[in-house]
C-alpha cells in the first residue's frame, strides 16, 4: 500500500454520529497511519457530534504517530473533488453516493447505519456486495478489520456504465405504440 493515502468519510444527509465518533479516536488515526493513510476528510452531514481530532501537521503534537491532516464539514454542493482525491471511501449506504463512487472506480466500504427507519440501506449494501462491487461493514466493532481486508482485496467487478437507451426505447414505445 502506498503512503500519503487519503480517506474520505461521508454520511450523506443522514445522522450517523456512531460512525463519526468511532473514527474520531487517536487509535483509529494511528491505525490509518499504519495502513499508509496521511489524510482524512469527514463529511458529517446532519449529525450532532462534531469531531474533536481535527488537525494539520502544524498543530499536531503527535505528528509522527497520527495523520498529517484531518478536517471535516457538514455539507458541500459537490463532492467530486473529495471523491477524486480519495484512495478509499467509507460511506453510509446511500445509493447516490455509492453509485457515484463506483462510477469513478473508487474503492468503497459501505458502513450500514442500522438506526435508520428501514433496512433498505442494508439490503442495497448486501446486494452490491453480492455483485462484488464493494465491501460492507455491518458492525462498527469490525470496521478496522473490514478496512484492512477491503484494502488488501485486489479485484472487484467493474460497475457497468449507465445506459439510457433501454429506458428511452421503452418510453418511446409507451408514448407511440
Stretches found by the model and what they are:
Residues 71-74, 134-143:
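Short acidic-hydrophobic, aromatic-tinged amphipathic segments that line or gate anion-handling sites
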Residues 79-118:
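A donor-sugar binding/catalytic signature common to diverse glycosyltransferases
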Residues 42, 150-177:
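C-terminal amphipathic helix plus adjacent low-complexity
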Residues 2-85:
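Donor-nucleotide binding loops and adjacent catalytic segments primarily
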Residues 5, 69, 78, 88, ...:
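Catalytic phosphate/metal-binding cores of nucleic-acid and nucleotide-processing enzymes, i.e., regions
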Residues 14, 74-77, 92, 115, ...:
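Residues at secondary-structure transition points
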Residues 107-139:
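Nucleotide-sugar donor-binding patch of glycosyltransferase catalytic domains
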Amino acid at each position: 500500500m502506498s503512503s500519503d493515502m487519503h480517506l474520505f468519510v461521508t454520511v450523506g444527509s443522514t445522522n450517523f454520529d456512531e460512525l463519526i465518533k468511532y473514527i474520531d479516536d487517536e487509535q483509529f488515526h494511528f491505525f490509518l497511519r499504519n495502513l499508509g493513510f496521511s489524510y482524512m476528510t469527514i463529511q458529517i452531514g446532519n449529525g450532532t457530534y462534531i469531531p474533536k481530532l481535527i488537525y494539520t501537521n502544524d498543530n499536531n503534537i503527535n505528528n509522527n504517530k497520527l495523520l498529517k491532516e484531518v478536517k471535516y464539514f457538514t455539507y458541500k454542493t459537490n463532492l467530486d473533488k473529495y471523491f477524486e482525491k480519495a484512495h478509499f471511501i467509507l460511506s453510509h449506504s446511500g445509493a447516490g453516493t455509492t453509485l457515484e463512487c463506483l462510477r469513478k472506480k473508487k474503492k468503497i466500504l459501505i458502513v450500514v447505519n442500522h438506526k435508520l427507519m428501514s433496512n433498505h440501506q442494508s439490503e442495497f449494501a448486501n446486494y452490491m456486495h453480492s455483485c462484488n462491487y464493494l465491501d460492507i461493514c455491518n458492525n462498527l466493532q469490525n470496521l478496522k478489520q473490514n478496512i484492512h481486508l477491503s484494502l488488501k482485496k485486489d479485484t472487484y467487478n467493474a460497475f457497468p456504465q449507465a445506459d439510457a437507451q433501454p429506458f428511452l426505447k421503452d418510453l418511446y414505445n409507451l408514448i407511440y405504440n
